[in-house]
């Protein structure tokens, strides 16, 4: 076997191990700071950013307030359900919504008719349900590698082996 074929085989095996060992059941994956930093340069200062799925300790909330952005946040834990609650004043949404309800989230986002940037799996581009939203155009801000998210058990470090690629859908 050639060295190139062996290397390719090792890379495929590494991807499979990452997929097989990652937690695909937990719907709560938290965004690391480097993924927030990726979107910051595209966010206008002076606008109010709504973080609809964020606690005070989230990387989105901490980084954006640290950088002087005007931020309003809400969370289900505080009785503010994204599908029923809307802050009085806001200009755009930035978030990492629960992937398992992405269709419902997209429907609500488009109903506002305001700008948004949400992290979603890249395969979210596919599907008849989402086509009605994306047919007139969608902007994608992608990463050069898969995001390693945090989960409840690993808040001080990232969890390696994400089973999917994610990007900002804008």
Residues covered by each model-derived region:
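Class I S-adenosyl-L-methionine-dependent methyltransferase catalytic core
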Residues: 1-170
């Amino acid at each position: 076997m050639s060295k190139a074929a062996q290397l390719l085989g090792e890379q495929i095996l590494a991807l499979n191990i990452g997929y097989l060992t990652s937690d695909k059941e937990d719907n709560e994956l938290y965004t690391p700071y480097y993924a927030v930093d990726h979107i910051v340069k595209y966010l206008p200062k002076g606008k109010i950013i709504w973080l609809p799925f964020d606690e005070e300790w989230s990387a989105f909330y901490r980084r954006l307030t640290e950088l002087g952005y005007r931020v309003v946040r809400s969370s289900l834990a505080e009785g503010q359900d994204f599908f029923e609650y809307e802050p009085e004043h806001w200009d755009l949404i930035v978030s990492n919504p629960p992937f398992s309800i992405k269709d419902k989230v997209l429907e609500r986002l488009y109903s506002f008719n305001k700008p948004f940037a949400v992290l979603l799996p890249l395969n979210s581009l596919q599907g008849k349900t989402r086509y009605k939203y994306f047919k007139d155009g969608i902007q994608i801000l992608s990463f050069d590698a898969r995001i390693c998210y945090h989960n409840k058990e690993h808040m001080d470090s990232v969890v390696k082996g994400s089973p999917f690629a994610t990007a900002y859908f804008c």
